C-alpha cells in the first residue's frame, strides 16, 4: 500500500529531472501528500508539464461520484482483471513525481517511516488516471498509485510498496502500447537503490505539512518504538 508521499524537490531540479517546462498551477512543495488532495502527475497528454489530479481513482463509467473510501492504489498483479483499472492501464497511465513516501509499521504503536532514493533524488511512481464527467460542467481528473510486492528494505515494514519506475522507462510507460513490456516494469525497485528512516508521528495527520515531517528522528533504531 502507499497512502502518503512527499514532493519537496526544488522546482528547477524537478523540471530538469523530468524534462518539464512548468506546470498547470504554481508549484508548491508537498511534505504530506494524502488521498483526496490534488497532487502532481505527468501524463501523455502533457508530458512536459505537471498537472494536478485528485488522488483516488474515479473511473469514467462510474454513474455517480463515490462518497466512500477513495481507491488510492491498484495492485500490479490484477490490472488487466479489474474493470476499474483495465482500460486505464491500457490507455491512461501516468507518472507520479515524488521524493519520498511514508509507510507505517503494523505493530500496536504505528511508527512512520520515510523511504527515499539513496541519492535523495526525485523519482516517479507508476500510476493510472481517469476523467469523470457525469455531472454537467463537472470534470474530475483522478489517479491511483500502482503497488507491487515489497523489496527487502520494505518487507519488514509492509507487504506492499509503490511501483517505482526506472528513469529509462518513463517515456514508454506514458505512451507505450506493448502490454508485456509495460507489465515487466511493474516490479519492486532494487532495495540497494533506496534507504529508509524514522520520522515524526506528526505525519499521521493529513492536516500536517511542512519540512519538519521529513526530518529523521534522532533515534534511528529502525524497529524500536522508543
Regions from the PLM with identified roles:
Residues 1-226:
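Short linear sequence motif anchored by a di-proline
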Amino acid at each position: 500500500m502507499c497512502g502518503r508521499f512527499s514532493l519537496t524537490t526544488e522546482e528547477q531540479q524537478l523540471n530538469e529531472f523530468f524534462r518539464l517546462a512548468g506546470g498547470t498551477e504554481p508549484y508548491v512543495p508537498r511534505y504530506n501528500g494524502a488521498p483526496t488532495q490534488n497532487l502532481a502527475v505527468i501524463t501523455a497528454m502533457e508530458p512536459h508539464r505537471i498537472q494536478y489530479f485528485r488522488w483516488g481513482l474515479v473511473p469514467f463509467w462510474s454513474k455517480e461520484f463515490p462518497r466512500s473510501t477513495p481507491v488510492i492504489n491498484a495492485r500490479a498483479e490484477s490490472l488487466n482483471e479489474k474493470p476499474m483499472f483495465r482500460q486505464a492501464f491500457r490507455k491512461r497511465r501516468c507518472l507520479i513525481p515524488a521524493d519520498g513516501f511514508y509507510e507505517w509499521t503494523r505493530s500496536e504503536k504505528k511508527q512512520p517511516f520515510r523511504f527515499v532514493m539513496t541519492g535523495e533524488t526525485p523519482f516517479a511512481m507508476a500510476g493510472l488516471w481517469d476523467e469523470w464527467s457525469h455531472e454537467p460542467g463537472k470534470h474530475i481528473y483522478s489517479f491511483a498509485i500502482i503497488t507491487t510486492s515489497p523489496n527487502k528494505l520494505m518487507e519488514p515494514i509492509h507487504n506492499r510498496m509503490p511501483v517505482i519506475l526506472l528513469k529509462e522507462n518513463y517515456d514508454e510507460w506514458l505512451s507505450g502500447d506493448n502490454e508485456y513490456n509495460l507489465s515487466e516494469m511493474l516490479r519492486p525497485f532494487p532495495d540497494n537503490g533506496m534507504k529508509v528512516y524514522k520520522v515524526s508521528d506528526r505525519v499521521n495527520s493529513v492536516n500536517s505539512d511542512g519540512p519538519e515531517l521529513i526530518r529523521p528522528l534522532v533515534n534511528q533504531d529502525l524497529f524500536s518504538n522508543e
